A protein has these predicted regions:
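Conserved phosphate/ATP/ADP-binding segment of small-molecule kinases
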Residues: 1-40
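Phosphate-handling active-site elements
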Residues: 39-40, 66-80
Length: 114
């Protein structure tokens, strides 16, 4: 993965964020490659044993919001992973009735308290 994101960064002249990274069955997270600093970072949360649509949108929104607010890519990935995890975890009890997205609103206070 590290070679892949570095090559992608070189090909696009941009930093790279890769989500859905997992090396352990019970963990899920993201990898960031900061092209300017030539650094690779990982951040993981517990994997919630279910799947919902819209988690990529939640991650991207939280990530870019954090970057705009001045956080580094590594810090933004951590924030986005934690926010997405909270949204999924809060939606898990309703998975039989709520399959089309996550209750991200329940995790917004995490972002507003940064």
């Amino acid at each position: 993965l590290e070679q892949l994101v570095k090559k992608l960064g070189e090909a696009t002249s941009a930093s790279v964020v890769l989500t859905g990274v997992s090396f352990q069955e019970d963990k899920l997270g993201a990898l960031t490659y900061d092209k300017d600093k030539n650094t690779i970072s990982y951040f993981f949360t517990d994997r919630v044993p279910t799947m919902f649509h819209g988690t990529g949108d939640c991650f991207a929104s939280a990530f870019f919001g954090a970057v705009v607010k001045g956080y580094s890519y590594q810090e933004a990935a951590k924030i986005a992973c934690e926010f997405t995890y909270m949204a999924v975890k809060n939606t898990e009890p309703f998975q039989d009735k709520h399959w089309y997205g996550v209750y991200f609103e329940s995790a917004l206070s995490y972002l507003t308290n940064l």
